[in-house]
Amino acid sequence: MGNETYLNHPTFGLLFRVCSVEDNRELFTTLYAQRLFFLVKNQGSLAFELLTRSDARMVVESRMRQLRRQGIREELYELQRVHKQTFQ
């Protein structure tokens, strides 16, 4: 997860990727305020689903549980750092 990924939203401007959720789905937040969160689905075209901060937190925590079960430590540690920085 060492790569930083950005995406330009037509209304909210530059978004920063928080994490990959599953195939073709990633969680993004607004770059500066980190108050708006979007679940972005990429299946030929981009679809943005607005999430509340608490829903975004649940998505990240669910992904951390999944990584823990799969034993993917490096990505888990990076996501724990992002979780702490973003939600605490």
Feature locations, PLM:
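Long, non-catalytic architectural segments outside compact domain cores
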Residues: 1-55
